[in-house]
Structure formats: C-alpha cells, structure tokens
A protein has these predicted regions:
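Conserved class I S-adenosyl-L-methionine
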Residues: 177-227, 246-249
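Conserved N-terminal segment of class I S-adenosyl-L-methionine
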Residues: 1-144, 148, 152, 281-283, ...
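C-terminal lobe and adjacent flexible extensions of AdoMet/dcAdoMet transferase-like proteins
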Residues: 256-317
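Active-site micro-motifs of SAM-dependent methyltransferase domains
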Residues: 138, 156, 185
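A structural helix-start
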Residues: 116, 158-162
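Glycine-rich phosphate/pyrophosphate-binding loop
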Residues: 232-268, 279
Length: 317
C-alpha cells in the first residue's frame, strides 16, 4: 500500500513515523492547552506501574462500546479492512492491538500530543503500524479512503467536536465505518462543576491539578471503603436518577468526579482524574445531541451503546 496516496499533502516516512509537509491550521489557545495536558498525562501513564491493567480494561471495554461480542468477533470484522485509522491514539496500545489482530491491514495511529514519540518507540517491531502526530480535526487524509476510522474517548477534547466528527467521517470510505465515543451529560450539579473547570484550568498550574487529582483519588478510595449503599429519590429537575447507589458512585455521577478502582492503583486513578479536570476542551453530549451529529453527517447507525459515562457506536455512510 502506497501511504502517500492517502494524504493530500506530501509525506515522508521515517521508520514507523509519518511526517507531512503541512499547512495545518494553527491550534486555538484551548487546544494548545489540551495538547500540553495530554502530553503530560500520557508521559505519567507510561511511567506508571499498572498500565497493563488499564490497557486490559480498555480493550474489553472497547468491545462493549462498539458492538463486538469478543476479540475474535473484532478480528473477523477487521479482516477485510485495508486501512485503519486510530484517531487520538495516545500511547498507541489500541493501535498496536488492532494491528496485531489485522496483520494484513495498515493501521495509522494519530495523536496531537507528544505521546506519538513514545508509541513509535514502544511498537516499532509491528510492521503494519504507523504513527502520525497531527490534530485529528485536520489530518490531511483524503476523503473516502479509510475502511475503519476510530475516535475512541477523544473527540470531546478537540476545539470543535462537531467539526472533527465531520472531518473524520469524511475520510471514511463508502463501504467503511466510523467508530466514535462521546462523554454523556451528567446530573446538573456535576455539569456545573465540570463547566467551571473548563475555564478555571487555564489559571491552575498542572502541578496543582495533579495534586488535586491525587486528593480526588483518595476521596474516591475512602468513599468506596465505606461500602455504604442507600436509596436515592428521583430528582428530575437536577437530572439525578433515583435508585440504589453506592455512596461513592452517587457522588461520582451526580456531583464530583472522584475516580477510584483498586485494581488500577493510585497512579492510574490519579491520571484518570487529571484527564477529566485538566483539559480545557471536554464537551459532553445528550443522546439527541450525539444522534443529531451522526445524522447531519449523513451516517447510518450500525451499532449504538449507551451507559452512564458515555454514548458510542459504529456508523457508515
């Protein structure tokens, strides 16, 4: 496969890295801040002791998010995909997973952050895997060329997610599919706090955000250790659903993200909390918002998933 034919700009390839002679749009201030945040976050995750637990969880969750019963079903699905793009690949572990499942395919992992350099080094032995540092809203990839485009847990962090969705869906081939995930809007008290941090993060140094993230991890841990369940009333005006809750999950979903998973350990949980509060770009969606974006780009829903955290699915032209 001649990779040069995929791009509207001239490219150069050095080992497993793609470079473009680019005239890309300058990043907005918020996108520059978000880029820096994720460069720092992925560096911390790479140095963490329990990233394999994170990777394992993310792969299993990926199957649920995009309608695959198991890894074999995903492998079969990928078997006729010549070109796969993982837009917003971070450290590249999912790109590498897909490349191993589909050894006859070309997989291109794209990310705006410096994580691309780490990914390139970590997976240089996979011959069908390439990495490309770029804004995923401005990839310079030609339209109608990619058999499977993935934007998993990333599109909300771009300057204009609706524009990014349009750009990524446009590069999907006529027989291809686009897999995308968006944050789901939460209860009103949590939304108000989250909106505050989208602006406040400009004025809070990253070291203070890491400190706060560690404190939120500790809060989540202590709340979980209480092991208290209670019955909450339904409060529809605030968007709070009634039902039986663990106290940590009730606060988490409705008031304050204080992530904690014992099997991930403190470092990965700190990074997860940092991931939420540090980026200035982090849009959330209602179901109708997400569906509108899909249909406005003339895409058909093949698979749709919803849970408290998100909406996701696979779509085709």
């Amino acid at each position: 496969m001649n990779l040069e034919k995929l791009f509207s700009n001239k490219i150069e390839i050095y080992q497993n890295l793609i470079f473009t002679k680019t005239d890309s749009r300058p990043l907005g201030f918020a996108q520059e801040q978000t880029k820096d945040v994720f460069s720092e976050k992925w560096s911390e995750v790479e140095d963490g002791n329990q990233k394999e637990e994170l990777y394992s969880f993310q792969k299993e969750w990926f199957l649920d998010l995009y309608g695959f019963s198991d890894e074999e079903a995903l492998k079969l699905y990928l078997s006729d995909k010549k070109i796969i793009v993982d837009a917003g690949c971070g450290l590249g572990y999912k790109s590498a997973w897909l490349a191993k499942l589909a050894p006859e395919s070309i997989v291109i992992g794209i990310d705006i952050s410096e994580s691309i350099q780490i990914a390139s080094k970590n997976y240089e032995e996979i011959p069908n895997l390439f990495f490309y540092q770029s804004d995923i809203a401005d990839t310079k990839i030609n339209i109608d060329t990619i058999d499977f485009v993935i934007c998993d847990q990333v599109i909300m962090h771009t300057e204009n997610p609706d524009h990014t969705f349009k750009d990524l869906s446009s590069i999907v081939s006529n027989d291809g599919e686009f897999a995308c995930y968006v944050y789901r809007k939460k209860a009103l008290p949590r939304e108000l706090l989250d909106d505050y941090f989208r602006k406040a993060t400009f004025d809070i140094p990253n070291d203070k955000l890491w400190e706060m993230s560690a404190q939120l991890t500790e809060l989540g841990k202590r709340l979980s250790e209480l092991d208290i369940k209670f019955e909450s009333p339904d409060i529809p005006v605030l968007g709070i659903k009634g039902g039986t809750y663990d106290i940590q999950r009730f606060i988490y979903w409705n008031f304050l993200k204080c992530f904690w998973r014992e099997d991930w350990g403190k470092e990965m949980c700190d990074a997860t909390n940092f991931d939420w509060y540090a980026p200035s770009n982090a849009k959330r969606y209602s179901k109708s918002d997400f569906e509108k974006m899909i249909f406005e780009n003339k895409m058909e829903i093949i698979s749709f998933h919803e849970e408290d955290a998100c909406y996701s699915g696979r779509f085709k032209k």
